[in-house]
Amino acid sequence: MDDLYLHFVQQLARYPFRKILLALSGGVDSQVLLALLARGRDEFGWDVTAVHVHHGLSPNADQWAQYCQRCCREVGMACQIEYVQLDVASGESIEKLAREARYRVLAPHVNAQTLLLLGQHADDQLETFLLALKRGSGPKGLAAMAAYAPFAEGHLLRPLLTVSRQHIEAYAKQHKLTWVIDESNADIRYERNFLRHQVTPVLTERWPSIRQAVQRSAELCAEQEALLQEFLAEALKKAITAEGGLSIAVLAEGSEGMRRQLIRAWFAHHRLPMPSRQHTERIWCEVALASEDANPKLKLNHIEVRRFQHCLYLVPPEKDLSGWRSALVPEQRLPLPQGLGHLQLTSKAGGNIKLPDDPSQLWVSFEPQGLEACPVGRVGSRKLKKLFQEYGVPSWRRRQTPILMYQNRVVCVADLFVDRDWSGQDCELVWFKSHDSVPK
């Protein structure tokens, strides 16, 4: 049993799985994995399948897909082709777009019993580490790629992560394997290719053990990051509100470094891209510490950081719904715009709304400007703007809260109050938020 195959088998023996899925690009690393997998399947009876992702970026993409299918047929392995389209005009790097698209189409193939195999090797790890270093990353970025990690409903494994490209190519030549060569790999305009051709050879010639050193550093960074996240998880429980906001008072208790890490953990909790160090400072200085009478907001990518009642909130940019209106037919669900869910006026004994004589005059709006109401239990009408403030509705939600109207009069504001003139027991207004089946 040769060294690489032994290493491969030992890697897989460490983890539980019932099925193996190989991400097959057709390059030398994935072709070596294919050969190792076929050998392991014959020896151990593994259930193995391959998936090739067709990015459509190269004029040779169709040929690569056919080549991967042919190679799999030769070893008796099923191979599925997944096609993706990349928005190359988005401004994002093609490398990032392609990587995200690959993971997106691979995910449905990975259930709880599946182990996804990826072909990244020690030279890829070195490049990833250097790219993170170039960006000024902390422990999370410098941890680079994990050898084993959760993915979709199962896990992924990079069994060649400690093996050099030179060793992989030597194995491929020794076993007379063939592979495709992506012509874009020679284009040093791409950062990773620049490192591969211009930087890594110099580093490895000067320090032959640098791959192993980088791998150790990456593992140490991953360990430090895991410990940090364990600590932050407890701190975040204290800082985060039931509505998902972040307490400014709790942030103020900690050091600058602690505050910065809590803000980043808050973003991670909401599954949003990490803010940079500069952005965390702006969140604190421009939003959290803004004057009491201000309504501060900071836009970061496709999200806004807002402040309300001594807490920070992450909200999507406000959409103008002032011109939207629609009739509301009792017992029928009304779809609301911008993913705000559905409304339904439901007959219910013991409800809180009196049904008007002519229900065809009922309609829904999001525009509170100029409207007044008197909630049940109060005396005298007030502007909706004032009522929103009294009910503690954040400014960004005030024009995203449905208002039920009858002709030109406010019947109720969803989830807040019913006007006293419309108090009754005929029906109730139910707001199904975010397309949930259960009203919130």
Swiss-Prot record:
Pull one GO CC term from this UniProt entry: cytoplasm
At which positions is ATP bound? 25-30
Q: Name one Pfam family in it.
A: TilS
By its UniProt entry, which Gene3D superfamilies does this protein fall under? 1.20.59.20, HUPs
**Where's it found, cell-wise?**
Cytoplasm
Indicate whether Ribosomal protein appears among the record's keywords: no
What the entry lists under InterPro entries is as follows:
Lysidine-tRNA-synth_C, Rossmann-like_a/b/a_fold, TilS/TtcA_N, tRNA_Ile_lys_synt, tRNA_Ile_lys_synt_N, tRNA_Ile_lys_synt_subst-bd
Q: Which reaction does it catalyse?
A: cytidine(34) in tRNA(Ile2) + L-lysine + ATP = lysidine(34) in tRNA(Ile2) + AMP + diphosphate + H(+)
Q: Does the keyword Nucleotide-binding apply?
A: yes
Q: Which domain of life is it from?
A: Bacteria
| Keywords (A to Z) from UniProt | ATP-binding, Cytoplasm, Ligase, Nucleotide-binding, tRNA processing
One example of a Gene Ontology biological process annotation: tRNA modification
Enzyme class label: ligase
Q: Which GO terms describe its molecular function?
A: ATP binding; tRNA(Ile)-lysidine synthase activity
Disulfide-bonded cysteines:
none
Q: What is its EC number?
A: 6.3.4.19
Its function, per the record, reads: Ligates lysine onto the cytidine present at position 34 of the AUA codon-specific tRNA(Ile) that contains the anticodon CAU, in an ATP-dependent manner. Cytidine is converted to lysidine, thus changing the amino acid specificity of the tRNA from methionine to isoleucine.
Q: Which PANTHER family match?
A: TRNA(ILE)-LYSIDINE SYNTHASE-RELATED
- Family the UniProt entry places it in: Belongs to the tRNA(Ile)-lysidine synthase family.
Its domain description in UniProt is: The N-terminal region contains the highly conserved SGGXDS motif, predicted to be a P-loop motif involved in ATP binding.
NCBIfam families on file: lysidine_TilS_C, lysidine_TilS_N
Name of the protein in question:
tRNA(Ile)-lysidine synthase
Q: Which organism is it from?
A: Vibrio cholerae serotype O1 (strain ATCC 39315 / El Tor Inaba N16961)
Q: Which gene encodes it?
A: tilS
